[in-house]
Design a protein with these regions (language model features):
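Conserved nucleotide-sensing/catalytic segment adjacent to the nucleotide-binding pocket
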Residues: 46-106
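Conserved lysine of the Walker
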Residues: 31
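Hydrophobic positions on the alpha1 helix immediately C-terminal to the Walker A/P-loop
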Residues: 34
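P-loop (Walker A) phosphate-binding loop of NTP-binding proteins
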Residues: 26
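NTP-dependent small-molecule kinase module
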Residues: 1-15, 118, 139, 161-206
Length: 206
């Protein structure tokens, strides 16, 4: 994780003064946990969770809201204010600030969608097969969320069929018993190859 944090810090800004980093993957693939650990390694970098931007009525049709509430202010170097969605109350809450920190993480399914990629400094993909990820997510959320998952899975299938993220990922992350394994992704550059190569052994784990 230290190597990834070092790589991100040295990147040029991508969204105003911010290095915006997307963490994408199938639901249940471990995005939130990974983003939280990466944020800590970055000294407390802000994390925008797309669960706060999406809603029951707009599982994936939230691009306009994200652009207006978050991306456009950050591009101006201003603090963004977004209204997080309350999934229990089924309504948006009071605005929450998101400062233009040197690195800001955007975590959630669809973080690497086409409309957002021009604003990203890097895109990370959690490398876990979708069926395995969905099984993990169902187990995590329990029987009470069965109906939600029954609707979510076909919606996620449609989203990635129309707007795939993985082919544009700079880095692939696999969670193992000893930590995270990191490999250059399909869109990886020489910088990823320098920091993360399959032959690096322990240096590719964190």
């Amino acid at each position: 994780m230290h190597a990834l944090a070092a790589l991100l810090r040295r990147l040029p800004p991508s969204c105003g003064p911010v290095r915006l980093v997307g963490v994408d993957g199938h639901a249940g693939s471990g995005k939130s946990t990974f983003a939280g650990r990466l944020a800590a390694e970055l000294g407390g970098a802000p994390v925008l969770r797309l669960d706060d931007i999406a809603s029951h009525d707009e599982l994936f049709d939230w691009t306009g809201r994200l652009l207006s509430q978050v991306i456009e202010p950050l591009e101006r170097g201003a603090t963004a204010h977004y209204a997080p969605y309350d999934w229990r109350a089924r309504r948006f809450g009071a605005p929450r600030p998101l400062p233009p920190a040197p690195v800001v993480l955007v975590e959630g399914v669809g973080a690497g969608r086409e409309a957002l990629r021009p604003h990203l400094a890097r895109l990370v993909w959690m490398e876990l097969p979708r069926e395995e990820a969905w099984a993990r997510g169902r187990a995590r959320d329990g029987a009470g969320q069965r109906t939600f998952w029954d609707g979510w899975i076909p919606a996620e299938r449609r989203h990635f069929a129309d707007d795939p993220s993985r082919p544009f990922a700079h880095l692939l992350v696999r969670q193992g018993e000893k930590g995270y394994e990191m490999l250059p992704g399909p869109a990886g550059t020489a910088l990823e190859a320098l920091f993360f190569t399959q032959g690096d052994g322990p240096s590719a784990m964190c």
